[in-house]
A protein has these predicted regions:
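Phosphate/pyrophosphate-binding loops at sites that engage ATP/ADP/AMP, CoA/4′-phosphopantetheine
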Residues: 163-170
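Active-site nucleophile and cofactor-binding loops and adjacent substrate-binding regions
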Residues: 33-46, 62-72, 147, 176-181, ...
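A short, small-residue-rich loop immediately preceding and capping a beta-strand
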Residues: 46, 57-88, 171-185, 205
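A glycine- and small-aliphatic-rich helix-loop capping segment at beta-alpha/alpha-beta transitions
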Residues: 49-53, 78-89, 190-201, 223-228
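Flexible loop/turn segments at secondary-structure boundaries
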Residues: 38-39, 70-73, 105-107, 149-152, ...
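Active-site/ligand-binding loops adjacent to catalytic centers
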Residues: 110-149, 157, 169, 194-200, ...
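Active-site-proximal loop->helix
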Residues: 63, 71-119, 216-225
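Positively charged, low-complexity intrinsically disordered leader regions
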Residues: 1-59
């Protein structure tokens, strides 16, 4: 796994000089760029680890879901590297793709019957991918976010960030990350949250989530299923309900009803803040950043 990481890690930590100038702020703004690998996102950090252990276990292949396609792309790459089959359930294209919800699974047919014309959700796709995995010999289901092992794989993001900042004597005041299922924000804040839990330092950590799927800001902290079909084990998290179908938006990877147990616990303890943002606001900010 570490040998594979060497192909694209460490990922660059970049200072946003032009953004600072545009905003007219005295603050120094840095961003961790995880798009420097072939898959284009941080998802490869966990995909390669899970594919490695799947191959070591002697499996034929894996099934999964993906929202925007980042996880599906990353897992497809990792499976190709280890010569594993990869079956992805999503709303658009990827490895071997099955539009979700689909007519190929019991869960998919049930959802389509109850909600004709639905745009689906990550929860729906998870249920379908799990159903195929448990009914196909030599296959297992793997998840690209939410679960604790995925966040542990993603801690490489935060560890690299802290090493780089420490090297130049920089202590961040505010740490911000987008939050869908929790792998991105969880990986980024891991070493900083650890310092806070040990009482060593204090940071302002902000998780930013979509207003159309605001699990932290409008959800309840309870045990809930990780999927719509109620096949997966219960997990304690901030959730909008496993049957919640979010409205369609342009951030497919953020259309998930719940939040990682680790991130949820940190939020419940008051160590991190959460804010929900409309996608139109995000587009405007992205345009400013790009310019």
């Amino acid at each position: 796994i570490r040998e594979f990481y060497k192909m694209y890690r460490p990922a660059p930590l970049v200072r946003a000089y032009c953004l600072e100038k545009k905003l007219g702020t005295p603050a120094k703004i840095y961003y961790k760029f995880e798009g420097n690998n072939t898959s284009g996102s941080h998802k490869l950090n966990s995909a390669i680890a899970q594919a490695y252990y799947a191959k070591k276990q002697g499996l034929k292949g894996v099934t999964t879901e993906t929202g925007a396609g980042q996880w599906g792309t990353a897992l497809s790459m990792a499976c190709s590297y280890f010569d594993l089959d990869c079956n992805v359930y999503m709303r658009t294209y990827g490895a071997k793709v099955t539009p979700s919800p689909s007519e190929t699974t019991n869960v998919g047919r049930k959802i389509l019957k109850e909600h004709p014309g639905t745009s689906g959700s990550l929860g729906c796709a998870i249920s379908e991918a799990v159903e195929v995995a448990v009914s196909t010999e030599g296959y297992r289901y793997v998840l690209g976010s939410v679960l604790s092992q995925v966040l542990l794989h993603q801690t490489v993001i935060g560890l690299e960030t802290k090493i780089a900042l420490d090297k130049y004597g920089i202590t961040p005041d505010i740490i911000i990350g987008c939050a869908g299922g929790g792998s991105n924000i969880g990986g980024l804040i891991s070493p900083f949250a650890g310092e806070m839990l040990r009482g060593e330092k204090d940071y302002q950590i902000i998780a930013v989530e979509p207003a159309s799927c605001p699990s932290l800001t409008r959800g309840v902290y309870a045990y809930d299923f990780c999927d719509t079909g109620m096949v997966c084990p219960l997990s304690k998290m901030y959730t909008l309900g496993c049957d919640f179908i979010p409205s369609a938006n342009h951030a497919g990877g953020l259309r998930y009803h719940g939040m990682s147990s680790i991130v949820s616990e940190l939020y419940d303890q008051g160590l991190i803040e959460a804010r929900s943002v409309e996608q139109t606001e995000v587009f405007k900010a992205a345009e400013t950043f790009a310019r």
